A protein has these predicted regions:
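Beta-lactam-recognizing serine transpeptidase/beta-lactamase-like catalytic domain environment
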Residues: 2-58, 62-295, 303
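Short, gly/Ser/Thr-rich active-site loops of penicillin-recognizing serine hydrolases
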Residues: 210-212, 308-322
Length: 322
């Protein structure tokens, strides 16, 4: 998990669990303990917040903002109901994009509320390979994060470009070859709160810190505002996938995600990553917070719903201590 102040860039927490006691290294460690740490299947020495991960549906607000910024997406265009399975045409062979919920009208706001894979696959095709690549490059993909701790670079492809139409479509809902670092994800989401500008994160506490922008005009102001309003609906609309985190005292925004990690569409043995990106939306509150959480192996544990519950507990503690 990563927690930041999305308006200043102050990093509030970087968490990787399971973990280990750093003091054991200072005092000296027996070979038995060292071997136990190294051989633990839960990998306590693997620093998860420094890695890149498949983001699943938490990527959809980013695609929405890219589509709105480039003009490829008309937020009021009805993509029409295709059922729960869709392919562009027969050139895709047996490959279909699947989704979980049917709803009407099939417009951007509803697609985010219901987390519609088919809508965002179509949106990605409308954006196109080259504009997708240039937009993600502008957001800092394939680039070092300007931060005190070195983290892995986010990527949109295993090569330097999106090679195939199906890969482009899958990228629209955070699958394909998309891999994102959680802190980088927080920086991108910060643009929804800062009129389209991505905040630069910092680690060391500063009194009355002046926010530094990492990427100016990552999205247009209008695009950022629309995605902000739509991600509020994800949490506050009873049909929203993040509704379990809804609060009556403050307005939250965010997006859930369940990323499938498997060898092929037919693979039933793969695992799932559960994601929840959630943030406060009142710039004037005392202690604003944005939390980006990813939990490995949530298959059979409720997918992203498992992470929503965890983050809701953290938010409750943070806000009650405020």
């Amino acid at each position: 998990s990563v927690a930041i102040n999305q308006y200043t860039g102050e990093v509030l927490a970087l968490v990787s669990t399971p973990s280990y006691d750093n003091n054991d290294f200072i005092r000296g460690m027996s070979s038995e303990k060292w071997n136990a740490l190294n051989e633990d299947e839960n990998k306590p020495m693997y620093n998860r917040f420094r890695q890149v991960w498949c983001p699943g549906s938490t990527f959809k607000p980013i695609i929405a903002a890219i589509g709105l910024t480039t003009g490829a997406i008309d937020p009021n265009e009805d993509y029409e109901n295709e059922g729960l399975s869709w392919q562009k045409d027969s050139s895709w062979g047996s490959y279909h994009v699947t989704t979980l919920h049917a709803y009407e009208p099939v417009i951007l706001k509803n697609a985010l509320i219901y987390s519609d894979n088919i809508y965002f696959a179509k949106a990605a095709l409308k954006i196109g390979e080259r504009d997708m690549e240039s937009s993600l490059t502008k957001l800092g993909f394939n680039e070092e994060l300007p931060f005190d701790i070195k983290v892995a670079k986010s990527q949109f492809s295993n090569t330097d470009k999106i090679e195939k139409e199906i890969q482009l479509a899958d990228s629209g809902y955070g699958q394909g070859q998309i891999l994102v670092n959680p802190l980088h994800m927080a920086c991108i989401y910060s643009a929804f709160c800062n009129e389209g500008n991505m905040i630069k994160p910092y680690l060391t506490y500063k009194e009355d810190a002046i926010p530094n922008v990492w990427i100016t005009a990552a999205f247009t102001k209008d695009a950022a505002q629309m995605v902000l309003e739509d991600t509020k609906e994800v949490i506050n609309n009873p049909h929203g996938t993040g509704y379990a985190a809804c609060r009556t005292d403050i307005t939250l925004a965010g997006k859930t995600g369940t990323a499938e990690i498997k060898a092929s569409k037919e693979d039933t043995t793969g695992t799932e990553l559960g994601w929840f990106s959630v943030f406060t939306t009142d710039e004037n509150m005392d202690r604003p917070i944005m939390i980006i959480s990813m939990v490995e192996d949530v298959k059979g544990r409720g997918g992203s719903g498992y992470v929503v519950k965890k983050d809701s507990q953290v938010l409750e503690k943070w806000l009650s201590d405020n």
